[in-house]
Amino acid sequence: MIRKVKPEIRVVGFDDGTFSFSSKVAHGRTILVGVVMKGAREVVGVLSRWITVDGTDATEKLIDAVVNSRFKDLRVIMLKGVTYGGFNIVDLDKLYLETGLPVLVVIRKKPDLRAMEAALRKHFPDWRERFEVLRRAPPLFELIPGKLYLQTVGLSPETAAEIVRTTTKTGLIPEPLRLAHMIASAVMTGESTKE
């Protein structure tokens, strides 16, 4: 449990790289990058794993990256959403239980669960299992009305908000997530894309 959020709190923020339609059809892969930071000030490391586009391995790859890393002083796992590589959905409870670390999801747009369910029904034989993972995710709360939403497992909304403020240098997105996005997109396309 996090009692006080220190300016140098150790966090890892994960985001995925871009992928093409052909990689979806061929069940290709995309990279998942985690940037380990002390607050918003110092990058101390980078983690990476390859995940299957529209697969079911994102949760296991995240667990593996965190548990088997040399960074044993991590306090929080940050995610930029719960779907990676298309519909490779992260089970937030499992990630929390198997790593022992609180999970903080940061998103800019409120997801449309009905549209997600419709897409899952249309494209995936295992749509029920995938949708159940989405449905079990904790409720969203607005940090900045209409602009920034959070989901948490193992953190109070107040502590989560404080962690976001502590780890954000510029803009709305915490620095570990912003950098993870840039690195992952550069690996996949040869150049970083804007957050």
Curated annotation (Swiss-Prot):
Gene3D superfamilies assigned: archaeoglobus fulgidus dsm 4304 superfamily (3.30.2170.10)
UniProt superkingdom: Archaea
Pfam family, one: DUF99
Family, per entry: Belongs to the UPF0215 family.
Protein name: UPF0215 protein TGAM_0348
Record organism: Thermococcus gammatolerans (strain DSM 15229 / JCM 11827 / EJ3)
Origin organism lineage: Archaea, Methanobacteriati, Methanobacteriota, Thermococci, Thermococcales
